[in-house]
A protein has these predicted regions:
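Hydrophobic/aromatic residues within well-ordered alpha-helical segments
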Residues: 47, 54, 58, 62, ...
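Helix-turn-helix
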Residues: 7, 11-57
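Hydrophobic/aromatic-rich alpha-helical bundle segments in the mid-to-C-terminal region
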Residues: 127-131, 135, 145-192, 202-206
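Short, Lys/Arg-enriched anionic-surface-contact patches
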Residues: 1-4
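Amphipathic alpha-helical packing segments from all-alpha helical-bundle domains
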Residues: 103-116, 120-149
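Amphipathic alpha-helical linker/stalk segments
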Residues: 54-94
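Amphipathic alpha-helical segments that line or abut small-molecule/effector binding pockets
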Residues: 81-104, 109, 113-117, 156, ...
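Short amphipathic alpha-helical interaction/hinge segments
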Residues: 62-66, 106, 123, 166-177
């Protein structure tokens, strides 16, 4: 039964990424899995339940990745700034892994494409797009860079300078740019070189 549930999630996400969440029906998902719609309802109550399962898996993987690279698990607060547990080396390693996963991992790349496709059609999808791919990463990096600079505004500008090219490289990768990961490596190396004090001060705060 677990295998069938996983296949349903996998095929549903593939269809969502190709056609958009709104355009896909339960019948189409069932057909892609090779079962009848009534059989699908034995595993999920409907399309929304399948989507919720996908999001739950996404959240679990995101948390696992943060722990693997010893990164803060969420944006910092005044009492517990995210930058206190991060170093520039970890930020770069974590960002490389995130980029690789968002482009090469089947599950994550499809999730990203689904959000990209649906962000203008569905307010919830737009919120999730911001959370995972736009405002969320910028806010996360702003908190991480804050201990190394004089103001939050400066930290936000650094976050934009660091993440902006990475964000653009997602689109270039989707357009066929297979050197995207190498370009990201060069960008991060240059960023660290141009901001050596930031790297040292952030590390000292860890």
């Amino acid at each position: 039964m677990r295998d069938t549930k996983e296949r349903i999630q996998s095929e549903a996400l593939r269809l969502f990424a190709e056609n958009g969440y709104q355009a896909v029906t339960v019948e189409q998902i069932a057909a892609a899995v090779g079962i009848k719609a009534p059989s699908l309802y034995k595993h999920y109550s409907g399309k929304r339940a399948i989507f919720d399962g996908i999001v739950h898996q996404m959240e679990a993987r995101d948390l696992q990745q943060a722990r693997r690279y010893q990164m803060p698990e969420e944006n910092g607060t005044a009492e517990n700034p995210a930058g206190e547990t991060a170093t520039m080396e970890r930020v770069c390693a974590f960002s490389r892994a995130q980029f690789r996963d968002w482009t090469e991992d089947k599950f994550l790349s499809r999730f990203r494409r689904m959000l990209t496709l649906e962000q203008y059609r569905d307010p919830e999808m737009a919120r999730m797009y911001d959370q995972y791919l736009s405002a969320g990463p910028v806010g996360y990096l702003t908190d991480i860079f804050r201990p190394g600079v004089d103001s939050r505004e400066e930290a936000r500008l650094l976050a934009l300078a660091f993440y902006g090219p990475m964000f653009l490289l997602y689109s270039l990768y989707d357009s066929g740019e297979r050197n995207a990961a190498a370009l990201l490596d060069r960008h991060m190396a240059r960023f660290a070189k141009e901001h050596p004090a930031l790297a040292v001060r952030t590390q000292k705060e860890g």
